[in-house]
Design a protein with these regions (language model features):
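Glycine-rich phosphate-binding loops of nucleotide-dependent enzymes
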Residues: 2-512
Length: 512
């Protein structure tokens, strides 16, 4: 019956130019349940929740609360109905304090005067009640990502929201913070609050959700009770085929040193401190070494230094015995370095170029693609067509497709095809599966393992601990710009890695 559901989204359709993001989707949320929303990258999950939160208006369909139709024209309407949302990218004012962010827009006042003491009292009471420890006077710019998420949750609770939407809430958290968030969700459930939980992490769904609705390509695939399903069944519903969730690989057979990093330091002039501090390690042929850590701990800057995007302050980098510390990006590429960048749009592709032109960005100057100083379009097309077929890159018009119009997964496949086809000595893969669905992740993992097995040295930089544990032969943890530990994935645990990632431990000592 309708009254069993606190929220019903019935036959929702939402269109954008050229795409139907939500196509006749129905979702029903019970009071006091954790309801997961699962789907591939681009399946329409965030769009559907943005409709519920009033950020988008649907072309068709209706929303009911407790059986009565409601109009949600904007987020203020949603808040008035008790609906709150923690976005994947937090909506906080960095130069404001924690307290000011929580009460922003609903500041208590008396005769026009701000009642900050009253607000502080309510915030601290909520913080204590739900175990969401925060410093109300700290600037948001000075607190950790995990703390920022607590601030976002307290924003919802301060507004007395009873329907809580979490959009990919664990993407930037340590394992310990993820466990803490799961406990907080269970506490909300006991109180009778209802939670909608957008995620692509099957382990988290199995751990905390009561039911799960699956979307595929904007369409409703079904809703299942978690107690009656498996991870394999959920992944099959999500991508339409069986997916191998574990990476199959043989033990590594490391060869000679390919990458030798010695005492690398990089200074951040804006923050007036070192972003990378005296980093030293080696990567051998035929092994995958992973640099793990929470986002913002120097991994990005280190990769920029390694690939030539930024200069080192100090240190030395050797590639296959050759000093490349001061080499140009092109020279590093010629010397055998391939790079799958963290931001495929910023550093991986020229979005308004065709797919074929993107495929030769690293080699258009080579003789096979030139004649008399002019690029041979026929050879570029021939080369691109081969890579598209070999790496199963799907696009509307093949090699002539403008890259901007392709899905994230196929854009990533295009970069991987280009970088691997060069037979590199060293592959640097930075968050290669970020934002991708399980089908694309499975494919990319197989390609990386195959590259290792060919004898390539692989440096993987990842925030996903499942990926780190599955792919790595050795793990290095980076915290605040320095390597604080080296681990064997066969003998360590996610929990142990999490302590080092959070700065609670450093090999040789424990911090307080």
């Amino acid at each position: 019956m309708a009254e069993d559901f606190v929220i019903e989204m019935l036959h929702i359709t939402k269109e954008f130019p050229g795409i139907k993001a939500n196509d006749d989707i129905t979702l029903q949320l019970r009071k006091g349940e954790v309801h997961a929303l699962l789907g591939e990258n681009g399946a329409g999950k965030s769009t559907l929740m943005s409709v519920l939160f009033g950020l988008y208006q649907p072309e068709a369909g209706q929303i009911r609360k407790n059986g009565k139709e409601v109009a949600i024209r904007n987020p203020n309407d949603a808040n008035a109905l008790g609906i709150g949302m923690v976005h994947q990218h937090f909506k906080l004012v960095e130069c404001f304090s924690v307290l000011d962010n929580i009460i922003l827009g609903v500041e208590p006042n008396k005769m026009g005067f701000l009642q900050k003491a009253e607000a502080r009292k309510k915030v601290m009471a909520l913080s204590e009640k739900y175990g969401l420890r925060v410093d109300p006077d700290a600037l948001v710019s000075d607190i950790s990502v995990g703390m920022q998420q607590r601030v976002e949750i307290l924003k919802m609770l301060y507004r007395d929201n009873e329907i809580l939407i979490f959009d990919e809430p664990t993407a930037v958290l340590t394992p310990q913070e993820i466990d803490e968030l799961m406990e907080i969700m269970r506490g909300f459930k006991k109180e009778g609050k209802s939670i909608l939980f957008i995620t692509h992490k099957l382990n988290e769904i199995m751990a905390v959700a009561d039911r799960c609705t699956v979307l595929r390509k904007g369409k409703y695939m079904g809703t299942v009770d978690i107690k009656d399903t498996t991870k394999e069944e959920l992944s099959r519903m999500m991508v339409g085929r069986d997916v191998q969730l574990q990476v199959e690989k043989q033990p590594a057979k490391p060869g000679a040193v390919v990458l030798d990093v010695q005492n690398v330091t990089m200074h951040n002039d804006q923050r007036k401190k070192d972003s990378v501090k005296d980093v030293t390690f080696q990567v051998h042929a035929g092994e995958i070494v992973c640099l793990a850590g929470i986002e913002g701990n120097g991994q990005t800057e280190f990769v920029y230094g390694l690939t030539g995007l930024e200069k080192l302050t100090n240190g030395k980098i050797t590639l296959d015995g050759k000093d490349i510390t001061h080499a140009t990006i092109r020279q590093r590429s010629k010397d055998g370095m391939s790079h799958i960048p963290e931001d495929r749009h910023k550093h991986g592709l020229v979005l308004d170029y065709s797919l074929e032109n993107n495929m030769v960005l690293q080699r258009y100057w080579q003789p096979e693609f030139q004649k008399g100083g002019f690029i041979r379009s026929d050879k570029v097309r021939e080369y691109s067509d081969r890579l598209i077929a070999q790496y199963d890159v799907r696009s509307g018009q093949g090699s002539s497709t403008i890259v901007r119009s392709m899905s994230g997964g196929n854009q990533q496949k295009a970069i991987i095809a280009r970088e691997l086809d060069r037979d590199p000595k060293l592959l640097i893969a930075v968050q290669p599966t970020r934002g991708l669905d399980v089908g694309a992740i499975e494919y990319i993992h197989k390609q990386i393992v195959a590259e290792r097995d060919k004898g390539t040295a692989v440096l993987l930089v990842s925030l996903e601990l499942d990926e780190v544990m599955n792919l790595s032969d050795r793990i290095l943890v980076m915290y605040e710009g320095e390597v604080v530990g080296e681990f064997d994935p066969k003998t360590t645990t996610v929990q142990e890695l999490g302590l080092y990632m959070a700065g609670a431990r450093k090999q040789g000592k424990e911090t307080k």
